[in-house]
Amino acid sequence: MCASLNEVKKNDTYGVSQKGYNDNFSESEGVLHGSKSMPTSMKNMLQSPTMVNMCDILQNKEAANDEKPVIPTTDTATAGTGTEDISSTQSEETDQNSHLIASEILEGTFKDVSYKEYANFLGNDNNNQVLTEFVKLLSPLPSSLLETLFNLSKSIYFIAEAQNIDRILECLSIEWIACHPNTHWKSGYKSCHIVLFSLLILNSDLHNNFQVDHKKIKFSMVAFINNTLRALREENEYEELKIYSREHLIIEELSEYYKTLNETPLPLCTESRTSINISDNQSSLKRFSTLGSREFSTSNLRSVNSNSTTLYSRDGQVSVREMSAKSNKNFHNNHPMDALYLKESFDDGLITENGSSWFMDDLILISKKSLPRKYSKRDKDQVAAPKMTSKRNKSFFGWLKPSKTTTLIEHTSRRTSLSYLNKDSEWERVKIQVKEGRIFIFKIKPDVKDIIQSSETDSATIDYFKDISSSYFAYSLLEAEAHVVQDNIIIGSGAMKSNVCNKNTKRKSGNFTVSFPENINGPKLVLEFQTRSVEEAHKFMDCINFWAGRISPVPLTQFEAVSNAEYGWSDKILTEHASLNLKNIVVSEWKPLLGLELLYEDAKDVEMVELKERLKELMNFTRQLGIWIDKHNEIKDKLVEIWSFDDNYFEAVMNNWNSRYLYMNNQYKKRLSYLKALQKAMGSVQF
């Protein structure tokens, strides 16, 4: 038996009810994946960032809430007499009872619940002691995390609600660290928890027949490794315990796990305790933790999709996005706003055409969690709030760190675009206008019932909506990007009630997100919205991406500028490395250049070009960027060969290679979104 689990208090709580969904894929994005595939010779390092958030969970759409069985909990003995002896005796009896129940679950003889509900029973927050005893019975645990997961899957029917699975994996991680304290994971049970969760998702992805747009799309090895690594880097202990110093070992470990799991799926335990192949139970697998998309979207792990982002931003202090920036101040003070685009003759007839790529206006819903805190409680007459500052988490992906009161999944749903998966999500009415390079948001007061439906843009209409709003603000769409998150959303908290949509409508609601890149004023921001229909969500997406693409300059400087810094792949290194003393080389950290969009929210100083010219720029840029990505891929094997002599150099160079690849690939996909939106808009223009 390994060290006791009782030393770690488990007080996580959940409120997540998640449903399956299908993300949309453009034809061009599919081309990207095919043309940027992993070289067959690559075995250990990362290449493709085309993966999704580990906590996007697919569950059976047919499993209604009222059909879920009630999971009993174990009684907790209390000292009714208040005497120490009685309390001690009852505590011992409770421990014995928990051990007995755990043993019966392991043997498959526990009759209080169906064997298919064992995992839900163990993951119930009131049954922590039984869960602890059950995990102890699995000891000694194998030295491999994947083999440990195999043993768990053979011991229990491991299909359950996501939060219950998460609790079980956390408990298993604690026990594994107790059994194996001298590995490169050190005492980092949270990191092991992330790996176990990622492996479970990978298993479902590889062996579930879930399809996207009628095409079976599976994670590649590099997507799995990349997703897992970026989640690990966000966990505080990953840096505090210096686990990252052995990251090359972790990469090798994850690659072996992928190859093993790709060939041999996790077993599915049956009532008779004989295991069957998980791929034979596709209907049940829909409730497994799986992934709804293969895209690196706004609901993903934080992406590297702006000129301001670098993969390893581990230090420094930054401010929260300054909401009282120039456009917002002008909006609140009724001052004219600077033009963000070069106005052309055809614009006059389109900028007020609601439902077009030029203009969208409607009353919809916004996730309360995504509302800027500075404005969530502000009075409408407050013009400018004091600047807020906060320390950035030293590790890059802090959203994945479980807090003391929440576990991985619920924590993630608060920080990413997962509110539609949470039955307890709160949504508020907003009037949204997207026009001329900006998005205007009016948060309607709760007590306002009858709202005048008007899409006019005159000052009187704007003043009316300001009067009935508790807050209102504006964003420039420079470098922003919109995505429709799913086509079939089930949401709690009375989403889309009568004040927003017709009760008799049978159309399914749609959801879209708008992401604003990390800039000099603060971190990446994601706003989540719900519309009356999926069609309307797509219209908002097209309009936002049209304006973002029209006003955002093509970042050619990022790729054409020549730096004197050595990142590990200079021409001299690639051609003369055999004659160089590589240990004397100073390898710098690769970072994108500071782009102009980081300095100006209203970017009036950015060169404005005609729509046709911007479209031409985007077409040429995406074509050229594809070539640069291919060239960057081609040097990867050479870098492995050159820098393998030293772990520290190898890690630094490969981190640089991966950072640049992620940046290029995300720029590629963002510009493709812009290109698609501009091409669609051009179809309605007569030159």
Curated annotation (Swiss-Prot):
Residues 14-35, 63-97 are annotated as: Disordered. It is a peripheral membrane protein. Residues 61-266 form the SEC7 domain. Residues 14-27 have a biased composition (Polar residues). Residues 412-551 form the PH domain. GO terms for molecular function: guanyl-nucleotide exchange factor activity. It is found in: Cytoplasm; Cell membrane; Bud neck; Bud tip. The keyword Ubl conjugation does not apply. Keywords: Cell membrane, Cytoplasm, Guanine-nucleotide releasing factor, Membrane, Phosphoprotein. Disulfide bonds: none annotated. The modification Phosphothreonine is found at T290. Pfam families: PH_GEF_YEL1, Sec7. GO terms for biological process: actin cortical patch localization; positive regulation of phosphatidylinositol biosynthetic process; protein localization; regulation of ARF protein signal transduction. The modification Phosphoserine is found at S293, S299. Its main location: cytoplasm. One of its GO terms (cellular component) is cellular bud tip. Residues 73-83 have a biased composition (Low complexity). It comes from the Eukaryota. InterPro entries: PH_GEF_YEL1, Sec7_C_sf, Sec7_dom, Sec7_dom_sf. Guanine-nucleotide exchange factor for ARF3 required for localization of ARF3 to the bud neck and tip and involved in actin patch polarization. This is Guanine-nucleotide exchange factor YEL1.
